[in-house]
Amino acid sequence: MNSPLSYNNVIEVTDLQRAFKQGEHEIQILRGIDLIVRRGEILALLGPSGAGKSTFLQAIGLLENGFTGSINILGQEIGSLNDKERTAIRRDHLGFVYQFHHLLPDFSALENVMLPQLIQGKSPHQAKEHAHFLLNSLKLEERLKHYPSQLSGGEQQRVAVARALANRPALVLADEPTGNLDEATGDIVLHEFLRLVRRQGSAAIIATHNMAMARKMDRIVTLHDGRLIEEY
């Protein structure tokens, strides 16, 4: 079997569909999505609220079941994997950034970035060294021992970015990553996020409703009413 690192296509999605029951009615959220993202590519998933962006990220992030279609990550067909194998893919190959940071409140900035590495099996020394590197790269060298409540919103989100990149994921999924920040702070966080993603060679899918943000990515696909309707 090929190593995951040998696959140029980080993720291949074919005919992905998702529907929910609402009383006697079935609400179709995703309607047959096809998408390929290559190693190192940064993709904007553009669409208004309710278009299905978050549902799509939950599906390809292996955070929810109930989908039909095919999701292939680094050559592994997700539908054929058991829960333990899916968890291993999330841990080893995926990183997540959300609109709200979801940092652990009782852990310092440094500890929040060390934790996913320790779970993956890194030694405390390795985890600390890499966490230092990421946080320093994000201009947080003076905030390593600060707890989330002691950080500004922009600083919290930069720690969340460092945590998402801590295990050098093949694919980072970001859902409106600057949506909770003012425009100036959001621009700074996005710039630093994209710089680090490119430096690591990760691919990324960034969901946004903001065309100005989307134009900073390598490629834009537009999601409307559960369908990919255009690409540029």
UniProtKB/Swiss-Prot annotation:
Residues annotated as domain ABC transporter: 11-232
Functional note: Part of the ABC transporter complex LolCDE involved in the translocation of mature outer membrane-directed lipoproteins, from the inner membrane to the periplasmic chaperone, LolA. Responsible for the formation of the LolA-lipoprotein complex in an ATP-dependent manner.
Origin species: Zymomonas mobilis subsp. mobilis (strain ATCC 31821 / ZM4 / CP4)
Entry keyword annotation includes Amino-acid biosynthesis: no
Membrane disposition: Peripheral membrane protein
Main location: membrane
Keywords: ATP-binding, Cell inner membrane, Cell membrane, Membrane, Nucleotide-binding, Translocase, Transport
Single biological process term from Gene Ontology: lipoprotein localization to outer membrane
Leading EC class: translocase
Family: Belongs to the ABC transporter superfamily. Lipoprotein translocase (TC 3.A.1.125) family.
GO cellular component terms, semicolon-separated: plasma membrane
CDD domains referenced in this protein's UniProt entry, alphabetically: ABC_MJ0796_LolCDE_FtsE
Subunit architecture: The complex is composed of two ATP-binding proteins (LolD) and two transmembrane proteins (LolC and LolE).
InterPro entries: AAA+_ATPase, ABC_transporter-like_ATP-bd, ABC_transporter-like_CS, ABC_transpr_LolD-like, MacB-like_ATP-bd, P-loop_NTPase
Record's subcellular location: Cell inner membrane
Name of protein: Lipoprotein-releasing system ATP-binding protein LolD
Pfam families for the chain: ABC_tran
